[in-house]
């Protein structure tokens, strides 16, 4: 008798998401949004908390192990520079895509009555200065960044730990083995937690749809739709072409392989919480473990393609609401500010809103305009987080291919 083929985890995650949408719509039409917040969302929150508690050990041990695996501090620097350049280029493209799309649709946006605009209130968080960001990257306390999950200092600690082991030669070998063992243990725990992803996804999606269902079909539906068109265009065009021509991989195989991470990001709205799943997906698709361990945690902190599209779309929309016509110079300023802000606000809580406040300030728009879209920010966040982690994965695969080819050239040269 032939055994029934079991459904894969990605299939169960997808089923969980669809079931959550259906259940959420039922609860929304029944007016039971508060019920889902009180009784269903907490189960999803437990799942997200379990993922988040792994983030610091995953980043610390995976980056340290990745640096040690690279075996050469020059190679660490080379991989870091390539990664940073790739992230900056895709972020700039994301802003351009967002601006092009929102300008195509801006004729459909109507200015809000002055009475409504006068009632808007939004307290913007102050964005740190560039020098303050640089200073904060280097921690004065070893444990504080880990306790507060401040990822940039944790990344710096991990890089120094790995570099210190490499510099110690044979004496550092035992520490290298310990770090490798710790990473293995953390990854096993991660795999246990990932098994509960379908349940977590179902609970989170149910609550999001039940609570925001009315808002989705409200007057902000058009701007949400424009943002999501931008997300899809960026994924299909920029990432699809990157995977095909830079990573030398079938885009279909890539999207199939990255699906579990995308669904997890869509429901948790956290790049850091999705990091363990993303690392697992990339390694299965052929990324070099030492590269994915280095590139993905870095990307989860500084790569914000989805957020960049969101900045561009929302800035033009808010300008239209105030009846302000943005010039070509303003558009160029949005591209520059959104691209640089993705690094400038890296690791800062509420980075999306802080970045948008910076963009609005640069082009002379009232920061209070953020209040127009703040109510449905969760809907924007689901798409932009998904885009952010997908970009991280394309980078890991691309850098892995470059490093494999570099190693092959060295081997061929040595064989001569």
How should these model regions be labeled?
Residues 32-39, 77, 214-222, 248-259, ...:
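Membrane-water interface of transmembrane alpha-helices in multipass transporters/channels
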Residues 52, 81, 85, 221-225, ...:
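Internal alpha-helical transmembrane segments of multi-pass membrane proteins, especially GPCRs
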Residues 255-311, 336-353, 376-398:
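Alpha-helical membrane segments and immediately flanking helix-loop junctions
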